[in-house]
UniProtKB/Swiss-Prot annotation:
GO cellular component: endomembrane system; membrane
Lineage of the species this protein comes from: Eukaryota, Viridiplantae, Streptophyta, Embryophyta, Tracheophyta
Coiled-coil stretches: 388-416
Biased composition (Polar residues): 385-394, 730-741, 750-760
Topological category with respect to the lipid bilayer: Single-pass membrane protein
Protein name: Probable myosin-binding protein 4
Top-level taxon of the source organism: Eukaryota
Species of origin: Arabidopsis thaliana (Mouse-ear cress)
Molecular function (Gene Ontology), one example: myosin XI tail binding
Keywords: Coiled coil, Membrane, Transmembrane, Transmembrane helix
Membrane-spanning residues: 26-46
Keyword hit for DNA repair: no
C-alpha cells in the first residue's frame, strides 16, 4: 500500500513539470505568432508606403545582446551562404549560385588572391575534392545571368586567374642572347626560376590535398614554357669571333708578344752562357771580315737583351747551335770534319739571322735568300737529359776542333788576304788589329773536301729546303730591307727596344756587355782558320749575288779565296738554309741544347709562329664544333622532352575529359533511372489506391446485401434486387417464370462477385 502511494507521488511530481513546460511552450508559440504578424504588418506597411525596409536585426531590442544566438541551426547555414555583390549595388544573394563575376566582386578593392579564393570556397561549404558538381546551365542568384557550374578545382583556377592575366602566369624573361660564358648557366637559372615560381603557385592547391589543382597549374606552366622561343643560333650570337689576319701580320704580332714575354721573363730565367760559346773571327792582316764582325755584334745584342747572372742555374748550360752543326744527327751521315768546320763558323751563320719574333732583328742579305735562321731549341724539363745532350755535343765539338788543328799543322804556308768593305761603325768597335794568315794549300784542300761533301749533302739538304721554302718566302716578304752595318743594326735594336717597357735598360746592358766581350775576345783571339775564311767568303759572295740591289759588299782581294768561292757556294747555301733561328721558341732566355735530339720536331716547328696559331684555331674550331653539336643534342633532347611532356599532358587531359564525360553520362543515366523508378512507384501507389477503393466498395456491397437478407428474409429475390436497382427493367419484361428467376439470380450473383476480380 505504501509502495503504491510512493509511485503515484513520483508520477505526479514528474508530470507537473512536463505540463508546465508544454504550457510555456504553447504560450511562446503564441507570442512568436503575434510577433510574426506584427513583422509582416511592419514590412507590408513599409512596402506600401515605399519606405526603406527595416532590418530584422536592427528592429530587435536584443541587438546589443547576443543576437547571434537567436538564429537557429538551419538559418545559420542559410545566412552564412548569403553574400553581398558589389557589382550590383551590394545585392545580397546565395553565393553558392553566384557566377564568377559576382562571387569575386570584392576583389575590386582587395585585389585577386588565390589563397583567399580557396579559403572562401572552403568556408562556403564547397567540397573541393568532390567530383559530382556537374549540372546543367542555370541562372546566377544575383544577376540572373546563365552560367554553368564546373568542377570546383577548375573554378578555383579560373577564380585565381581572373583579373590578373599577367600575374597568374610565370614570369618568363625574354630570351636573351646567350654568350659562351653564360650558356649553361643562364638557361638553367631561367628554368629554375620558372620551376620555382610554378611550384609556389601549385603548392597553394596542393597543401590541402588538391593534387589535381596543382596538376592543372603544372599544365599551365608547361604550356607557357613551350611558348618560350629558343633558337639554336642564340647561343652563338655573342661569341667573340677571332680576327683573321694575314699570315705576316699575325706572325709578327705573335712574335712581338713572345718578345715582350721573353723580356718580362728575363728577370726570372737568366742562364749562364758558356765561355767558348761565341768565337770572334780575325784575319791575319790588319783588316777584319765585315760579315764576321756584323754577325758578332748582332749576336752580342741578341744575347745581351737578357742580362747574365753567372751564379744562377750553374748546372745548366746554354749553347746556340746552328742546323749545320746538328747535321750529323739530323740528315744522316755527313762527315764529322764538315760539322767541325761549320762549328767554328757559328758567328758567320748567325749574321744571317732574320728578324725573329722575339729578338726583333732584321734579316741580313745572305739570310733573306739563303733562308739562314737559327732555331732556339727549348730545353727538356728533365735536367739530366739536357745535361747529357750538352755534354755529348761538347765532346763532339772538341773532337772536331782537334781534327781541325791537326789539319792546320800540316798546312803551314799561308797566303792571300781577305779585304772587306771598311765600315766606320765597325772600325770604332774593333779593338786592336789582328792579322791571321790564310794558306793556299789549306784553301785547296778545303775546296776538294767541300766538293766531296757537296754530293753527299745535296740530297739530304733538299729535305730541309722543302720544309723551309714556304716559310722563307713569308719571312722575306714580311721583313724590311736588311741592314749592312753595325750602326743600322744598333738603330734597329734601339727602335725595337723602345716598343717595350724595359727595352732601353736591356739594350744598354746588352751594349755594355757586348763591349766587354769584345775586349775579352780581342785578348783571346786566335788566328783565323781556313774554315772560318770559307764561311766569310761564302756569306759575302751570297750577299753579293742575291742582294746586290739592297747593299753592296766590297770585292774580295785574295785570289785563292776567290777560287774557293764556286766550290763552297752551294754547300754554304745548304748549310745556311738548314740553319734556323732559335729565337722563335717560347720563353725569353730559355736554355738551348743541340738540335740533334729533336731534329724533326724542330723542322716541323720551323713555322711555329703560324703553326701554333693554326693549331689553336683548329682546336678552337673543334671546340666550337663540339659545343655546337652538344647544343644541338641538348636542344633536340629538350624539344623531345617538351614534346613528350606536351603529349603526356594532352593525353592526361584527354583522359580527364573522357572520364568527366563518362561520369556525367553515368550521372544522367542514374538520374533517369531514379526518375523512372519514382514514376513506377507513383503508378504502383495509384494502382494500390484504386484496388483499395474497389475492395472497400465490395465490402460495402456485401454488408448491404447481408443487411437486406436479414431485414427481408421472406421477400423474393427479385424484389430485393429491384430495390437495390439491379433489376430496373423487371417491369418491362414481366417475366415470372422460374427459369427466368434462376437466370436472373445467377446473373446477379455474377455481377456481385465478378466485378472486383475483373478489376484486379
Amino acid at each position: 500500500m505504501d509502495s503504491n502511494l510512493i509511485f503515484d507521488q513520483k508520477v505526479i511530481n514528474g508530470f507537473a513539470p512536463v505540463l508546465t513546460y508544454a504550457a510555456c511552450e504553447w504560450f511562446l508559440i503564441l507570442l512568436m505568432f503575434i510577433d510574426a504578424l506584427l513583422s509582416y504588418l511592419l514590412v507590408w506597411f513599409a512596402r506600401y508606403c515605399r519606405l526603406q525596409m527595416p532590418c530584422f536585426l536592427c528592429s530587435k531590442l536584443l541587438h546589443p545582446l547576443h543576437w547571434r544566438f537567436l538564429l537557429c541551426r538551419n538559418h545559420r547555414s542559410e545566412v552564412s551562404s548569403y553574400m553581398s555583390c558589389q557589382n550590383h549595388g551590394n545585392n545580397l544573394a546565395d553565393c553558392r549560385g553566384m557566377c564568377d563575376d559576382c562571387l569575386l566582386s570584392f576583389t575590386k578593392m582587395t585585389g585577386p588572391n588565390p589563397d583567399m579564393n580557396r579559403l572562401l570556397l572552403g568556408k562556403l561549404g564547397y567540397d573541393l575534392l568532390s567530383r559530382s558538381h556537374f549540372a546543367h546551365p542555370r541562372s546566377c542568384s544575383c544577376c540572373n545571368k546563365p552560367w554553368r557550374t564546373r568542377h570546383h578545382t577548375q573554378r578555383l583556377i579560373r577564380l585565381g586567374s581572373r583579373g590578373r592575366n599577367s600575374s597568374s602566369k610565370p614570369n618568363i624573361p625574354a630570351p636573351r642572347h646567350l654568350t659562351r660564358r653564360g650558356s649553361g648557366g643562364s638557361l638553367k637559372k631561367m628554368r629554375d626560376h620558372i620551376a620555382t615560381s610554378g611550384s609556389e603557385y601549385v603548392d597553394v592547391g596542393s597543401r590541402d590535398g588538391m593534387a589535381h589543382v596543382g596538376y592543372t597549374e603544372l599544365k599551365i606552366h608547361s604550356d607557357s614554357e613551350s611558348e618560350f622561343l629558343f633558337s639554336d643560333d642564340d647561343a652563338f650570337l655573342h661569341i667573340t669571333d677571332f680576327n683573321v689576319e694575314p699570315s705576316e701580320k699575325r706572325t709578327h704580332k705573335s712574335r712581338r708578344r713572345k718578345s715582350f714575354d721573353d723580356k718580362k721573363m728575363s728577370n726570372h730565367k737568366q742562364p749562364v752562357l758558356q765561355d767558348n760559346q761565341y768565337k770572334k773571327i780575325h784575319v791575319e792582316d790588319n783588316e777584319t771580315v765585315e760579315s764576321s764582325m756584323l754577325g758578332y755584334n748582332l749576336e752580342n745584342r741578341t744575347r745581351q737583351k737578357q742580362p747574365v747572372k753567372a751564379k744562377e742555374h750553374d748546372d745548366v748550360l746554354s749553347e746556340l747551335i746552328t742546323m749545320s752543326e746538328a747535321r750529323p744527327f739530323l740528315l744522316g751521315s755527313p762527315r764529322k770534319y764538315a760539322a767541325g768546320v761549320v762549328t767554328q763558323n757559328e758567328n758567320e751563320a748567325e749574321v744571317s739571322g732574320s728578324s725573329s719574333p722575339s729578338g726583333g732583328e732584321f734579316l741580313s742579305p745572305s739570310a733573306e735568300n739563303g733562308a739562314s735562321r737559327e732555331i732556339r731549341i727549348q730545353e727538356h724539363d728533365d735536367s739530366s737529359d739536357f745535361s747529357q745532350n750538352i755534354t755529348s755535343s761538347a765532346m763532339e765539338i772538341e773532337e772536331f776542333e782537334a781534327a781541325i788543328e791537326q789539319k792546320e799543322s800540316d798546312h803551314m804556308d799561308v797566303s792571300g788576304s781577305v779585304a772587306n768593305e771598311p765600315s766606320s761603325d765597325e772600325e770604332n768597335e774593333v779593338e786592336g788589329d789582328s792579322k791571321p794568315l790564310i794558306s793556299n794549300n789549306m784553301s785547296d784542300s778545303l775546296e776538294q773536301e767541300q766538293s766531296g761533301e757537296e754530293e753527299s749533302e745535296v740530297n739530304e739538304n733538299n729535305v730541309a729546303e722543302e720544309y723551309f721554302s714556304n716559310e722563307e718566302e713569308d719571312e722575306v716578304n714580311g721583313h724590311t730591307e736588311p741592314l749592312t752595318s753595325k750602326s743600322e743594326s744598333g738603330s734597329f735594336a734601339e727602335e725595337q727596344s723602345s716598343e717595350d717597357e724595359d727595352g732601353s735598360n736591356i739594350y744598354s746592358v746588352a751594349k755594355d756587355h757586348s763591349s766587354n766581350e769584345e775586349d775579352v775576345d780581342n785578348e783571346e783571339s786566335e788566328p783565323m782558320t781556313s774554315n772560318n775564311v770559307t764561311g766569310v767568303v761564302k756569306e759575302e759572295h751570297s750577299a753579293k749575288e742575291e742582294h746586290g740591289d739592297h747593299e753592296e759588299t766590297e770585292p774580295l782581294t785574295s785570289l785563292n779565296i776567290s777560287k774557293e768561292e764556286p766550290s763552297l757556294e752551294h754547300s754554304d747555301k745548304d748549310s745556311l738554309k738548314i740553319t734556323e733561328t732559335r729565337n722563335t721558341s717560347n720563353g725569353s732566355p730559355e736554355l738551348k741544347h743541340s738540335a740533334s735530339v729533336e731534329s724533326f720536331v724542330s723542322i716541323s716547328s720551323d713555322i711555329e709562329g703560324e703553326s701554333l696559331v693554326e693549331v689553336l684555331k683548329q682546336q678552337l674550331e673543334h671546340g666550337r664544333k663540339s659545343l655546337r653539336d652538344l647544343n644541338k643534342e641538348f636542344e633536340e633532347e629538350r624539344n623531345a622532352s617538351a614534346i613528350a611532356t606536351n603529349q603526356a599532358m594532352a593525353m592526361i587531359t584527354r583522359l580527364q575529359e573522357e572520364k568527366a564525360a563518362l561520369h556525367m553520362e553515368a550521372l544522367q543515366y542514374l538520374r533517369m533511372m531514379d526518375e523512372q523508378a519514382e514514376h513506377d512507384m507513383d503508378a504502383l501507389e495509384r494502382a494500390n489506391d484504386v484496388l483499395a477503393d474497389r475492395e472497400k466498395e465490395i465490402q460495402d456491397l456485401e454488408m448491404e446485401l447481408e443487411y437486406y437478407r436479414v431485414k427481408y428474409p421472406d421477400e423474393p429475390r427479385e424484389e430485393i434486387l429491384a430495390s437495390m436497382g439491379i433489376l430496373g427493367n423487371t417491369e418491362e419484361t414481366n417475366v415470372t417464370s422460374p427459369t427466368d428467376e434462376t437466370s436472373i439470380k445467377d446473373s446477379t450473383d455474377t455481377k456481385l462477385t465478378g466485378s472486383p476480380s475483373a478489376e484486379n
